[in-house]
Amino acid sequence: TTLRKDAEIIDCKGACLAPGLVDMRAQSADPGAEHLEDLHTLLHAAASGGISTIVALPNAKPVIDDASMIDSLSLRATRIGGARLRLYGAATRKLRGKAMAELGLMAEAGAVGFSNGNRCIMDSLVMRRLLAYSAMLDRPFIQHCEDHDLTAAGEMNEGETSTRLGLIGAPAEAEAIIIDRDLHLIRMTGARYH
């Protein structure tokens, strides 16, 4: 193609050119801890860094576990501008890992998937049900793969360094165990999973 003579030329040497990036696991302090970071700051900081869309995990305080919160945050984000905001609905009420949240209502309100944030679903029956509902609603499930029974006391990754320093290590198998279990459940349910 030919450029117009009056076209602005931007020197991009040393720069990284890419389409807008998507942050699939954003942490938001809003609602609940806006003194740390509010939605305006989050969305504009993301846009300034080349992030065009962020998908916020539900582990705010209060937890994003009902449709009205999805509606409210989505509306506020539209008014604020900056990066686009998408939301995961909490998989379980208050992220406790036991009682399922209202997945269907959150999906209708615009939740793009479901997650328990940085807390793994340890109960296999609850996880099976969550995956079945996620599949039925055509939404992915985003899991934090970590067997908390194996990592609760861990101060760092288990290995030579943790042994040498005398620190309690968290074994890598804590992640593999959850992934293995969840792969079996995904085969049963046909759910999409990340």
Regions found by a protein language model. Give the residues of each.
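Histidine/acidic residue-rich metal-binding segments in metalloenzymes
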Residues: 98-194
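N-terminal metal-binding scaffold of metallo-dependent hydrolase/deaminase domains
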Residues: 1-4
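Active-site mouth loops of central-metabolism enzymes
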Residues: 24-37, 58-60, 86-99, 166-173
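General beta-strand structural signal in soluble alpha/beta enzymes
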Residues: 10-11, 56, 86-89, 113-116, ...
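Active-site-proximal loop/turn and secondary-structure-junction residues that shape catalytic pockets
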Residues: 59-62, 91-93, 120, 147-149
